[in-house]
Every structure is written in structure tokens, then in C-alpha cells.
Regions:
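Active-site loop/helix belt of alpha/beta enzymes
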Residues: 2-82, 86-90, 156
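C-terminal accessory subdomain/extension
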Residues: 88-214
């Protein structure tokens, strides 16, 4: 017997206990057959929700079980974009579609080859953040179909040359924070990552391997 909790990501939700009681009742009627109730968030509600097996889904990627609360797991997803070009801006200029951001003084803008066609949500326009090393670089202007623009004025020029990588999700910028900036949930961020990204799998019995995107 298998079921799913409606409020597992809210530990205090009263429906969790009521659903558990109903599940126990059904299981008794089915002569103690194999039982599974807990998804990723429900695993953390306690052993009474575990039964014979659990269904970790997004937890396999280190996403926190309760939005807005400290994450007990290590994040295992890292999303990087490659810098395509860097332009010096010497006079006031606008950036991107709709001219929604203006660079007022001398600065540098990096164009990164990631966009909403890759699942980097357009709602991150003028809100997203990348990291070069441990230094944040703000996303400026709108997210385009295939490109984003980052203000890299604070980064030494030799660290943000074309071909260098920027962390869009990583140790300094976890999925939960990206989701909050985008006004959504981590599930949407992860499931939306497009086929054009190259997947690299690190660790495990197979060591390191890569899978090319379309």
C-alpha cells in the first residue's frame, strides 16, 4: 500500500497525523502488506512514517526537506555557466532587453551562455546571483533565451576571462536561495534544468563521468 502526504514539508501541519492514522487503518485492512508513505520531506517527520520503504526524490540532490529551515543535508548539485564575453563599460549604458538595468560608471559586464531556454528562470532577471570563487556577482538586466549578463566589476580581470566558469548554483548559492530569488520552489529549479547542460557525475562506484547535453 502506497500513499503520499499533502503537507510533508510542513512538519506541524495537522493533516500529517490524520493521514498517518488513515494509512495505518488501511494497512491493517490489507493484512500488514508492504507499506510506503514517506517522500523526501516525510522521511524527516520521524520513524513512524517510514514503514517498509521510503521514497527519497529531491533529497537525493540535497534539497532541504522544509523550506525556510536549515538544511540537514549536503547539496550535491552544482550549476556552472561559461563566460562568453566581457565588455568594459566606460559611460552610462543600459543592459539587456527592455533596458531594465543601467550601468552608471566605469564597470565590466560578463555575458554568460545560459538562459531561460536552459531552465534558468526569467523571473531571476535583476535578482539572480552568480559566484566567481567566493565572490558574488549580481545578475543585471533581463534573463534572455540563451544568455544572462553579470556585473563583474568587482572581480579581477584575469579571473573572469571568456571561457571561465561562473557558479549559478553551488556551495555559496544553494538551490533553495536560487528558488527564493526566483519566487518558486527548489523542485522547479532542479526539474527545469535543460538538456543543453553537460552533466558530470562525480563520486560513487563509477568515479567521474560526463553526459553531454543536446
Amino acid at each position: 500500500v502506497i500513499s503520499h502526504l499533502a503537507g510533508a514539508d510542513e512538519p506541524a501541519h495537522p493533516k500529517n497525523g490524520r493521514q498517518l492514522e488513515a494509512f495505518l487503518d488501511v494497512r491493517l485492512r490489507l493484512h500488514q502488506g508492504q507499506a510506503c508513505l514517506a517522500n523526501s520531506s516525510a522521511i524527516f517527520l520521524g520513524p513512524e512514517y517510514h514503514f517498509d520503504m521510503v521514497r527519497p526524490g529531491v533529497a537525493l540532490y540535497g534539497l532541504g526537506p522544509v523550506p525556510g529551515q536549515p538544511n540537514p543535508m549536503a547539496q550535491v548539485v552544482r550549476l556552472q555557466g561559461k563566460i562568453a564575453q566581457v565588455r568594459d563599460v566606460d559611460t552610462p549604458q543600459t543592459v539587456g532587453y527592455g533596458a531594465t538595468h543601467q550601468v552608471e560608471g566605469p564597470g565590466r559586464i560578463a555575458t554568460v551562455a545560459v538562459g531561460y531556454a536552459d531552465g534558468y528562470l526569467r523571473s531571476l532577471s535583476n535578482k539572480g546571483t552568480g559566484y566567481i570563487g567566493d565572490t558574488p556577482v549580481p545578475l543585471v538586466g533581463r534573463v534572455s533565451m540563451d544568455l544572462i549578463t553579470l556585473d563583474v566589476t568587482s572581480i579581477p580581470a584575469h579571473l573572469c576571462l571568456p571561457g571561465a566558469f561562473v557558479d549559478l548554483i553551488g556551495p555559496n548559492n544553494p538551490v533553495e536561495r536560487v528558488a527564493e530569488d526566483a519566487g518558486t520552489i527548489g523542485y522547479e529549479i532542479l526539474t527545469g534544468l535543460g538538456r543543453r547542460y553537460t552533466r558530470v557525475y562525480v563520486g560513487g562506484a563509477g568515479g567521474t563521468s560526463g553526459a553531454g547535453g543536446a
